């Protein structure tokens, strides 16, 4: 939780507020793969057990290698967790029964890996008793009254602190330059840093320089960042699988852009249409594939950059679409 405790506190304060009887208690954390969203919402939920004495329910809406949970399946799963018997009901009846139960109890529902607003809406109740905390893979802009927070890479100081917490002060300070290299090779992503720290802590005979050397190979980096069932590659793969074809295909044309880019670069590589290029840039940002890196030299046009883990995965782990190297139409 290096650098994230203020956000944890804000989430807890919002979800436990009772001063407004019409206040919808919904909080959404959005960010790219590896940004630590799951750990963040679990930490926030852990401190709210007393506020929701009727229970906390955790649901992974899109587990690895599985189809996303439909709204109806989610409703029935939460109903079962609350002791309901939804089997005989149709979707509308089951949804109404769930909302009634949530309005009469103090329950916190925690949803991980949300892909769409439709997965969340069935749980929203105009009542302050229950609350919903969501980790989302993309913007859920259509959800009403949400308390939204974006997370991404850690600041450099927080990233170094996270690695130091996992590996130990003595080791990181004895190899400061190697520690800095590891932090940057991990793109300061909490998941990548966590895996790197576990790799080192379970190998006390290996140096940070050894790890930095392994991570320096960009083609193998994302595959190497795996310990047990924790994998940066798997995290990014889940995002990539959810991308529609009209987003995934152009993404392959942008992966060799290591720096920032804007409308002109997209028009040169993907489409001659300025409107299409602008819409694509919006969609990539909306889906947490890119982040805003600044504005142009004239202070005007927005500049973007691919999230490093997304770029590495797209470049080295999945084949490009047919005709990738053909000129853009």
Where are these regions (language model features)?
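Amphipathic alpha-helical segments of the small helical/lid subdomains adjacent to P-loop NTPase cores
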Residues: 123, 152-194, 279
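Conserved ATPase-coupling elements of RecA-like P-loop NTPase cores
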Residues: 114-123, 144-146
